[in-house]
Amino acid sequence: MKKLLTLIFGMFLAVMAGAQDPIFSQFYAMPLQLNPGFAGTAAAPRAGIAYRNQWTGFNSAYRTYAAYYEQSFNRLNSGIGFHLEGDNAGDGIFKTNRFSAAYAYRLKVNDFIALKLGLEMGVHSVSLNWDKLIFPDQIDDVNGITFNSEEIRPDNTGRTSLDISSGLLILSEKFYLGVGLKHLNTPNQSILRIKNNLVPGLPIRYTFHGGTEWVVKKGNKGKEPSFVSPNFLFVAQGPYKQLNVGAYASLGPIFAGSWFRHTFGNADAVILLAGFREGPFKIGISYDATVSNLANNAGGTFEVTMGVLFPHKKRLDINDCTRMFQ
């Protein structure tokens, strides 16, 4: 019991002192969360939802929900997208909600390379359920929670701020590269004060990602090609850094993948993915097998995503290397 309470309280302080965005293991399934430059990258409108349960060994440690919709306007060389995300830490103690709209402009460099410049604006809100907090002065060594806390409730247990992000994509038939800059204005999510100073705003999140695509079997009418896509994802936000390296493979209606995630302080997890595609629908299930010192207590991370790529008559002239995102 004490171990769980200590975890939740420490987790709350960590969120307040230097919050970080949730990063989906199936990052390809939430492209706008990765980089606003992905708005309108697919040949047709697409949408998706995702659910992530992090550290299943603890009771509702972190749960994240997300949804998006985006489409292209070929005649305008443009794309738009909308992203909604909710993050629930400590079984409802601390909640984060985000809603944003993205616009991306596509600039064709030549017959082989295109650039996409993305801009995203939205709102970022945080809320604290003070009544669910358990403080050390409430715990009796013998009887457990028996006292009222002397901690003072903040005047404001919620805050909403403007959130601005941008991104760049380089697309070709042989590779893709991208950089995303989230929270450029470092939204103020302060609820607590430390030594009479407000807790700093949400740190800028730097995301670098890229990959290539090897076609194993060419597609034909009604059938997508089979391919393997080696890729990487690097994220830095405040003191936190992570690197995912692995590959995604699509073989007919079945797809799978495996990545290794390293957090620079230590090896973190091995990510295993399996899924299938039926018509315009795509469902993926992944599991993060924790290999760090948390493995014995925290358990792994479970994630499920579902996407739909609406029917289309033709593909964009340059986007073949991002099929794993579609």
What spans do the regions from the language model cover?
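Subset of outer-membrane beta-barrel
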Residues: 20-326
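N-terminal signal peptide c-region/cleavage motif recognized by signal peptidases
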Residues: 14-16
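Sec-dependent signal peptide recognition
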Residues: 2-10
